[in-house]
UniProtKB/Swiss-Prot annotation:
GO terms for cellular component: cis-Golgi network; cytosol; endoplasmic reticulum; mitochondrial outer membrane; nucleus; perinuclear region of cytoplasm. This is Protein angel homolog 1. Keywords: Phosphoprotein. One of its GO terms (molecular function) is catalytic activity. InterPro entries: CCR4/nocturin_mRNA_transcr, Endo/exonu/phosph_ase_sf, Endo/exonuclease/phosphatase. Pfam families: Exo_endo_phos. It comes from the Eukaryota. The lineage of its organism: Eukaryota, Metazoa, Chordata, Craniata, Vertebrata.
Amino acid sequence: MIASCLYYLLLPAARLFRFLSDAFFTCRKNALLAKSSSPQVEGNFAMAPRGPDQEECEGLLQQWREEGWNQTLSTASEGPLADKGLAESSLALLMDNSGEQDTASEDKWSSRQLSDLRAADNLDQPFPEVLGEEPLAEDEGPLWAAVPVQTGPQYADCAVLPMGAMAAEQWEEDPAMVAWSIAPEPMPQEETSMWPFEGLEQLQPPPMEIPYHEILWREWEDFSTQPDAQGLEAGDGPQFQFTLMSYNILAQDLMQQSSELYLHCHPDILNWNYRFANLMQEFQHWDPDILCLQEVQEDHYWEQLEPSLRMMGFTCFYKRRTGCKTDGCAVCYKPTRFRLLCASPVEYFRPGLELLNRDNVGLVLLLQPLVPEGLGQVSVAPLCVANTHVLYNPRRGDVKLAQMAILLAEVDKVARLSDGSHCPIILCGDLNSVPDSPLYNFIRDGELQYNGMPAWKVSGQEDFSHQLYQRKLQAPLWPSSLGITDCCQYVTSCHPKRSERLKYGRDFLLRFRFCDLACQRPVGLVLMEGVTDTKPDRPAGWAECIFEEEISELEPVFPRTIGTIQHCLHLTSVYTHFLPQHGRPEVTTMPLGLGMTVDYIFFSAESCENENRSDHRLDRDGTLKLLGRLSLLSEEILWAANGLPNPFYSSDHLCLLASFGMEVTAP
């Protein structure tokens, strides 16, 4: 009886207790799910502090609770793989550990997205592929490939990566860099070193599979069939054509003294043996008739350059810089095309003059073109070629102007003909001045007003206007003792030659009898009674300084202009210093990664007035005609090739090459 009562009483109670227990555990599970984002859970369910990763996971979890069950149930019939994903997803909901939440959130990505995320986070564990998804095709394209920015809806929830949220908050990717990314590589490669100057982040290093000559290709610009500035066609008569190259080849000693300028270069391309072979290959390729070189190291010249150039058919003249400098300038020409008339080395150093205490030099050659015998009895005017390397110091524009005045005076003397005119002139070299600077305008326009000009502004290389103290040019720029006029001519060239032995008459000499110097007792004169003890008495009315005019006649005096220098050589530049097809300035060198033009080829041209703008001088071809030139490059193109020097160009300057024609006249 009791047992029956217990059976009927305890069985319902047990069932009720079981029901309440199940309800209790169900409520506990729901409570844990609701509190899974709280950091206050104790024990094994404790979580790390909230951050961008956890917030992203919470958003994904909430989205899954709202939409995921229906999508999961709808795919339950697709197969065992879907069931496995459902089971794993359900199990992930019960996991409150931060690492397990990351794994659960990654299950939301497709296999392609997960592979990208794994690659970004350097994770090696592969993820199972989604059923029906095609495998990724291997990229067999070039190393550097343009990849468009992904903006599709499938990436809308991928703004923050699970493992890289903090990095994404600290650094924002440049859109220009996002558009360019590296294609998948089979093997890791070292990152190419790049220059740390402004703007370079917009460029990528060139592919190593692409030869440098494809990046640094220079076009030959032919002007032989184009009209000149006045619309006149080139003459149809015979011409003596030749090419001239000007090249600063970078002395090895100077490169080693300023090694900080070439940290971007691989050591192998800075080796002299590599550079020498590259330079000789460049000379052989362009094969100029006249070669003007700067920064030629003396030992390299005599041991390697001169013998090699002589084997190529050149006759060379070299002038080393004064002092202890080891480099200099060289002018080489082919004796089959020219005959040497005279060679004049030019030294800018003048003892005792602070303005001219630098060791730069120049070379001036007068060459006679050799006309082929087939043209008969014809003649060609001589050609004057000047080559120089002017002082670099951007602050000493006064020194640069004085050096240029000495060179122009030497050119004026060498190129002057018997009738007072000048033969065709080519002046080239490294002038360490930018286009449209006062020094450049002085060479091109033939006149410069310099009085009061800051010395740094002469070359325009750098801007020192912010400095408190600035050296300013004062008139006269150089002393009269230099023997050069303000028209950049030697004084002896401006006055008729005088007899070396001067003749004076008796009356002229007697005028010095009672001058101040004659009435002074010489120092150390022995006193002898009746001989040297007499003091001369100047007659009354005798002028003390009556011979000043005579002294002025003996010493030639040239007038000095106030703050203006001039020259009459009528020079113009071969290059225009602008690339219209690129919309960028031309560049001949890149010191510290900043491109600029400092190398030039100037040649003789006839000046003519411009009817529209009388203040601007136009030039047209004269006896010497420009037939073509080798184009220069822009700063951006040289950036793409990692600057200068590089494996293709072995100097920190680009070579300049031009073709000329000279009129051939009958005698």
